Amino acid sequence: MTILRKSHPLMKMVNHAFIDLPAPSNISGWWNFGSLLGLCLIIQIASGLFLDMHYTSDTLTAFSSVAHICRDVNYGWLIRYIHANGASLFFVCLYLHIGRGIYYGSYSYKETWNIGIILLFLTMATAFMGYVLPWGQMSFWGATVITNLLSAIPYIGTDLVEWIWGGFSVDKATLNRFFAFHFILPFIIAAMAMVHLLFLHETGSNNPLGIPSNCDKIPFHPYYTTKDFLGIVLLLTFFFTMVPFFPDLLGDPDNYSPANPLNTPPHIKPEWYFLFAYAILRSIPNKLGGVIALILSILILALLPHIQTASQRSLMFRPISQFLFWLLVSDVLVLTWIGGQPVEPPFIIIGQIASLSYFTIILVLMPIAGINENKMLKW
């Protein structure tokens, strides 16, 4: 078996990626989220495929087809809730994965980091289009509001929005194309994840100390396969406790009403995992300014390798930067809360302060902290 593992063209690729891969001996549980994201993607593709067999992408029947899946299809309710909550689980793992990358300086691997940012954009696009498909009230109005943001682009904005809609409003053509893209994008994400791994294995994994670990590597199997398996068991235990008992915990009650273009919900908001970006969008009174801030709230991650001023890579021995990192985490949580609140005082001013803090911490305070820590450590 060993000879086949090292000689067969396909087995050899798997062997180099998951069995004989040299890995640092000290990576912690925070490095588990890559494999957990792979598991989430598999769950989403598998459950989505079964939902696709019963779903119809037509404005007249989309809502009732989802109801049909839940009521008439064998275990259809379970598949639907696995898919809906699987998206939330995907984003939990994704944000923790990004947080670990920021804390331990993994953004120094620029190619891997940039592919990761592209993966984040693709995942967000997929989730947004998936939210539109049940054709409930929040699906329809969310699609209308978010796609309408493109009209802020000078000169071509209005034409671009109508081109995306396939008409003068969100309608059957919009639902059809969103369904098509929602189906194909996860496979593109899977392909990009392979590229992400390819670049990662070129450099090797980072470690909590942020120092080269070439002198102290261990094989990925059995050490980290066992560790990943433990993470998978814990994740699935949590997930399959949540799905049957609290399936609608993270959903919006408005989406249980069929889409009605004549009745606007009192508060239009996206799913919880977009609320921090939505709060940043709303905090700027100007439409174009809000759209630019929304895009920059994600694109700012691409700047991290270029604004790194500290000589040490990891935050493990940098207390000032550690404090700023946890301040940033708290700020994102505040933005998430604000994004779910109505646009009225005091939420408006809190959102504006939190949005300003988000960009200030990343662009100003963290680089200054890095310079000061270099002086303190005499590096």
From Swiss-Prot:
Species of the source: Dipodomys nelsoni (Nelson's kangaroo rat)
Question: Which residues are listed for a ubiquinone binding in this entry?
Answer: 201
UniProt-listed CDD domains:
cytochrome_b_C, Cytochrome_b_N
Task: Quote the protein name from its UniProt record.
Answer: Cytochrome b
Topology in membrane: Multi-pass membrane protein
For this protein, what does the record note about how its cofactor is bound? Binds 2 heme b groups non-covalently.
Q: Which GO terms describe its biological process?
A: mitochondrial electron transport, ubiquinol to cytochrome c
Q: Which residues bind heme b b566?
A: 97, 196
Q: Which gene encodes it?
A: MT-CYB
First-listed, main subcellular location of the protein, grouped into a coarse class: mitochondrion
Keyword Transmembrane listed: yes
